Each structure stands twice: as structure tokens, then as C-alpha cells.
Amino acid sequence: MADKNLRFLVVDDFSTMRRIVRNLLKELGFNNVEEAEDGVDALNKLRTGGFDFVVSDWNMPNMDGLDLLKTIRADGALGTLPVLMVTAEAKKENIIAAAQAGASGYVVKPFTAATLEEKLNKIFEKLGM
């Protein structure tokens, strides 16, 4: 079972979606959740440190989720952060692109709390969290 004090950053340009993900994480016992509205905002927050997990949308202005993922993976300090992509992009090529860029997991919107929990648990298990 993962540490319930893990610090999550939820990245999505749609505030309602950020709130939904935040509330689902709270239902799962994770209360340490912050939000960012795009990849640029997310990177600024991530670089201040202290985050344990990123949940990111794909389609966002300024810097999309795939570019955010690639930037995180290329950053020495952030490179090992687990990143779960939560997106409406259900095409096989998108899922492959995210996997090749180093996504820890992929959830297609809309999704349930059970789906989110299952994906998180797989990532926690794989990373020994």
C-alpha cells in the first residue's frame, strides 16, 4: 500500500477535471494534492520540489502533457517521477507515444475511481512505493 502522504500534482487546463481527479485521489486517501493548469505551470511547481507523483492531461495550452512528460524524463532532478497520463486521447498511436516518452501509466477519460485506483496501484507496485 502506497504512502497516503505522497504529494500529487494534477495538471489539466480544465479546472473541473482537476477537481474531479483531486476528489478521486481524496477518496483513495491521498489528500496532499496540488494543481497546475498547463505544462509550464506544472514544471515551475515541480522544480520547487517535493512532489512524488504527477497526473497529467495531454491536450493543454502552452505545453501539452506529452511535452511535459518528455521534459520531466530529461530533467535530472525530476526524471524518476511517476507520471500518469489522464486524457481523452484514446488512439493507439497516442498511447504508444506516451509509453515511448516514459509515461508510468495511461488512463482514458472518462474513467471511474476504480480505474484510477487500479492504475495507481500498478504504478506503485512496479516502483515499489
From Swiss-Prot:
Limits of the Response regulatory domain: 7-124
NCBIfam families registered for this protein in UniProt: PRK10610.1
Role of this protein: Involved in the transmission of sensory signals from the chemoreceptors to the flagellar motors. In its active (phosphorylated or acetylated) form, CheY exhibits enhanced binding to a switch component, FliM, at the flagellar motor which induces a change from counterclockwise to clockwise flagellar rotation.
Protein name: Chemotaxis protein CheY
One GO molecular-function entry: metal ion binding
Description of post-translational modifications: Phosphorylated by CheA or acetylated by acetyl-CoA synthetase, depending on which acetate metabolism pathway is available.
Known cofactor(s): Mg(2+)
Originating species: Yersinia enterocolitica
InterPro entries the UniProt entry points to: CheY-like_superfamily, Sig_transdc_resp-reg_receiver, ST_Response_Regulator
Localization terms from the record: Cytoplasm
Cofactor binding notes: Binds 1 Mg(2+) ion per subunit.
Cited CDD domains: REC_CheY_CheY3
Major subcellular site: cytoplasm
Modification 4-aspartylphosphate occurs at: 57
Domain of life: Bacteria
Binding-site residues, Mg(2+): 12-13, 57, 59
GO cellular component, as recorded: cytoplasm
Positions bearing N6-acetyllysine: 92, 109
